[in-house]
């Protein structure tokens, strides 16, 4: 605010650089952030997520993508990094209640719309598979 370089600003810069670097290693040309952006798009159906930046929701989506791809080791490492940089590692951090079935079904349906980039992933996608991936992220983030 006053031309000072604060620790909070440094933390944000570190998170952006670290997050961007990790994203590049998550998949091949078409899958790097395929699910991450689709998850962002799905979350936008809930008005309470409007206050969160695009990148914040994509960051959570990266965790879901790792879960979908069965990358448990990567998921564990990313959860630790997200927690260190105060990025959302749980849906609650985005003010989303995974136990609200009606609300969460809307997120899943929107995430899985035809044409969403999540369909580039080399996995069979169903609402149940995607829900399990979200649940896995929540489990790893405890």
Label the predicted regions.
Residues 72-142:
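C-terminal charged capping/lid subdomain of soluble metabolic enzymes
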Residues 1-81:
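Active-site segments that bind and position negatively charged phosphate/pyrophosphate groups
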